[in-house]
């Protein structure tokens, strides 16, 4: 809502406050219930807005109930529109109807402004309009201007309405002459009212001009007195204009302006007197017209009474039609009631039959109760037996697994036993050879003692330490073989699990193909349980396989660590062996310089020891390591190939000709061993 519209509302509210009303009418909330507006309309035109109509407006218990406000405002607006159309013969088709809901709920100022405009039009066009116009003229100039603007908007939107048909036309056949006179008088009254309105507007404009001229005259008189008091006057450019004296140029100009203003004042006063005379003439004409209007109002009152009688007859006719419609509905209901009675009889007969059937069913239920208990017992026994069978099968699987583990351990122990027996035989042979060689080595004992005494203490300690480590590595080779055996067992277990998984997958695929080939609705109940069991077995096997793979990877890591340690030890032994040979050659040279006989004996003993070391140590070590590496590489290659084959088959089966459920039941392809190792 813009500012000027709010100003118009507040000016209309100030005019409305001047009315003597019983209901509160000081603000928008008090006007929103419609009580004050109804009282004002009753005060303006009591013959149209009667006391009976005013009693229909609910004044008490309205409060904040917007529905009661809405009903009051509807009655007020409807009666106002009827007053404009019937009494004033004005059409408000171009005037936007106020939104009553927004007034009742939110007290919208814009909509209240439109409603107050309509009420103002009723006040200006009523029988006692002169008193209300004088009250408006007593208000402030701004309020008068806003009220005049509101009246101009209302005058611009209203139009002369054509003669309406209906009940009035039917009644006007009897009193056509009176209506024609009333229409002519009404038109004369409207023309005079329009002339009065225009003269009032001209009067207001002239009054405004008069006030403006008086203000300008007062200002000029003040300026003239100020100029007479002061001897010198300074112009706009700051130059002194000199004293205002008679006969001077400035005095003549001021005198001429004063004369012009006096002439204009005289013209305005003459025009005002002319307008006063015209207004008096129009007042006399208005009095004559009011007398004629009163006569016409009496005739219009008779017409309204006839209208009321016609409305009463209409209402009675409508009530009669409603009663006839109700009679027809009651007849239909009576027919429906008779039909319902017949249906109730049929239902009673059926209920009697149902009672007999229920009695028979109860007897049958008592008979079947005993058999039902036995069936439930058998079901429980079957469930217990199934649970026992599952437990026994799981125990059997565990025992088989333990048996396989024990067999593997037994084989490993047997192999260790065989290796120990071989070592024992070798040691016995070595002891026998040493016993035989002690006799031959007594002669060369002095040379060896001399050579050992000749060797430095650091090299002797290193050689002793290397010999001890060599023995420990030989002894630990048995543990390494045990680890290799464990790795072989784990690989075998992985192969067994993969074979079982392969058979399970083949069985699943065969069942899925069979279920697809036959009718799925008939075979679904038969193959559902088997597929679920096989899927559970498949998941268990995959978990076991993953565990075995993790064990095999850990064992392979251990084997690789041991291999690296062995290679490092062998390199250290080779380095120390080269140093040892250098030291021996130096010792030989020293001994040759001392005694050539001892040197020849030393050469023979050193060559025998070196040949024994070469024959004993590297050959069996390298052969065992090569065999273990070859077997582990072979098992890895077999596992990777088998897994790739299974994944390719699963990918082919999942991609071609399978239903959505069959694809969901298939297990996802597993990751490769290389990816698991990298993790």
Curated annotation (Swiss-Prot):
Pfam families: HOOK, HOOK_N. Keywords: Coiled coil, Cytoplasm, Cytoskeleton, Developmental protein, Endocytosis, Endosome, Microtubule, Synapse. GO terms for cellular component: centrosome; endosome; microtubule; synapse. Residues 135-437, 480-574 form a coiled coil. It comes from the Eukaryota. The keyword Magnesium does not apply. One of its GO terms (molecular function) is microtubule binding. Its main location: cytoplasm. It is found in: Cytoplasm, Cytoskeleton; Endosome; Synapse. InterPro entries: CH_dom (IPR001715), CH_dom_sf (IPR036872), Hook_C (IPR008636), HOOK_N (IPR043936). One of its GO terms (biological process) is determination of adult lifespan. Residues 6-123 form the Calponin-homology (CH) domain. Disulfide bonds: none annotated. Involved in endocytic trafficking by stabilizing organelles of the endocytic pathway. Probably acts as a cytoskeletal linker protein required to tether endosome vesicles to the cytoskeleton. Involved in modulation of endocytosis at stages required for down-regulation of membrane proteins that control synapse size. Not involved in synaptic vesicle recycling. Required in R7 cells for boss endocytosis into multivesicular bodies (MVBs). Has a role in regulating adult longevity. Belongs to the hook family. The coiled coil domain mediates homodimerization. Homodimer. Interacts with microtubules via its N-terminus. This is Protein hook. It comes from Drosophila erecta (Fruit fly). The gene is hook.
């Amino acid at each position: 809502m813009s500012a000027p519209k709010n100003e118009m509302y507040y000016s209309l509210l100030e005019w409305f406050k001047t009315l003597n009303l019983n209901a509160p009418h000081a603000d928008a909330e008090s006007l929103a219930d419609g009580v004050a507006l109804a009282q004002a309309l009753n005060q303006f035109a009591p013959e149209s807005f009667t006391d009976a109509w005013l009693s229909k407006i609910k004044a008490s218990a309205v409060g904040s109930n917007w529905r009661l406000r809405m009903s009051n405002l509807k009655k007020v607006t409807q009666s106002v529109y009827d007053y404009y159309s019937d009494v004033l013969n004005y059409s408000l088709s171009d005037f936007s109807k106020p939104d009553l809901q927004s007034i009742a709920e939110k007290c919208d100022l814009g909509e209240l402004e439109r409603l107050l405009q309509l009420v103002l039009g009723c006040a200006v066009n009523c029988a006692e309009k002169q008193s209300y116009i004088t009250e408006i003229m007593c208000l402030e100039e701004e309020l008068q201007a806003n009220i005049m603007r509101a009246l101009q908007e209302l005058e611009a939107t209203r139009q002369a309405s054509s003669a309406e048909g209906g009940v009035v036309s039917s009644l006007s056949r009897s009193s056509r002459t009176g209506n024609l006179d009333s229409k002519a008088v009404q038109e004369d009254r409207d023309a005079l009212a329009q002339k009065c309105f225009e003269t009032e507007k001209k009067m207001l404009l002239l009054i405004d001009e008069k006030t403006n001229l008086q203000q300008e005259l007062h200002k000029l008189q003040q300026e003239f007195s100020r100029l007479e008091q002061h001897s010198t006057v300074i112009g706009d450019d700051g130059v002194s204009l000199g004293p205002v004296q008679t006969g001077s140029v400035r005095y003549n100009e001021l005198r001429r302006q004063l004369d012009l203003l006096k002439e204009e004042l005289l013209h305005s006063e003459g025009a005002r007197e002319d307008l006063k005379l015209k207004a008096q003439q129009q007042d006399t004409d208005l009095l004559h017209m009011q007398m004629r209007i009163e006569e016409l109002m009496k005739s219009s009152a008779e017409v309204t009474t006839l209208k009321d009688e016609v409305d009463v007859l209409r209402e009675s006719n409508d009530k009669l039609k409603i009663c006839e419609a109700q009679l027809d509905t009651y007849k239909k209901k009576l027919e429906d009631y008779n039909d319902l009675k017949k249906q109730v009889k049929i239902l009673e007969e059926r209920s009697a039959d149902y009672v007999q059937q229920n009695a028979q069913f109860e007897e049958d239920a008592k008979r079947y109760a005993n058999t039902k208990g036995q069936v439930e017992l058998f079901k429980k026994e079957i469930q217990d037996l199934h649970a026992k069978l599952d437990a026994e099968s799981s125990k059997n699987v565990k025992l088989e697994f333990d048996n396989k583990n024990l067999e593997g351990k037994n084989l490993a122990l047997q192999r260790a036993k065989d290796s120990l027996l071989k070592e024992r035989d070798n040691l016995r042979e070595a002891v026998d050879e040493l016993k035989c060689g002690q006799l031959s080595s007594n002669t060369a004992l002095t040379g060896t003692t001399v050579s050992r005494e000749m060797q430095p203490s650091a090299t002797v300690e290193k050689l002793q330490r290397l010999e001890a480590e060599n023995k420990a590595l030989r002894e630990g080779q048995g543990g390494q073989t045990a680890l290799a055996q464990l790795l072989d067992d784990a690989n075998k277990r992985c192969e067994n699990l993969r074979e079982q998984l392969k058979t399970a997958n083949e069985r699943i695929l065969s069942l899925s193909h069979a279920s697809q080939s036959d009718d799925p609705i008939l075979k679904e109940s038969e193959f559902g349980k088997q597929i679920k069991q096989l899927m559970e077995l498949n998941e268990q096997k995959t978990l076991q396989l993953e565990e075995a793979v993790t064990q095999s990877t850990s064992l392979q890591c251990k084997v690789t660590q041991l291999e690296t340690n062995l290679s490092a030890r062998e390199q250290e032994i080779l380095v120390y062996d080269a140093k040892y040979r250098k030291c021996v050659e130096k010792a030989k040279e020293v001994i040759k310089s001392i005694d050539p006989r001892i040197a020849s004996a030393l050469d023979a003993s050193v060559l025998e020891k070196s040949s024994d070391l070469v024959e004993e140590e590297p050959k069996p070590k390298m052969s065992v390591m090569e065999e273990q590496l070859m077997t582990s590489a072979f098992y890895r290659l077999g596992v990777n190939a088998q897994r790739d084959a299974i994944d390719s088959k699963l990918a082919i089966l999942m991609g071609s000709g399978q239903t959505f459920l069959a694809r969901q039941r298939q297990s996802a392809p597993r990751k490769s061993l290389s990816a698991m190792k990298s993790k």
